[in-house]
């Protein structure tokens, strides 16, 4: 039913997020709008990838977005959304989230919450994801 209440706090716990990648070297697919990359392991010591991992998207609006991979309906570290172009779908509850324009809002399924969103800063060919 997706009654997304935009004022609700995400049930995904706040844990450290600090992750940097080089677009060309680490994720060349992020040079094409509509593409994304899922990060489930830190790439080096001192990198933190949130609760269930990071979903980094290059939106159709030419901006970068990042979300926690954990489904906010299931809120379990091991239940991660799977991405197909501009939608991320939970394999457990079937909720579908819009990631193509960075909202993370649920547009189909049971989740009352959007995906937990993180901040992305681009500097040259580097992307940095923080809380």
Features from the language model and the residues they span:
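Sec-dependent bacterial lipoprotein signal peptides
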Residues: 1-2
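N-terminal pre-ligand scaffold of iron-sulfur
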Residues: 5-84, 116-131
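Surface-exposed, polar helix/loop patches in the mature regions of secreted/periplasmic/lumenal proteins
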Residues: 73-109
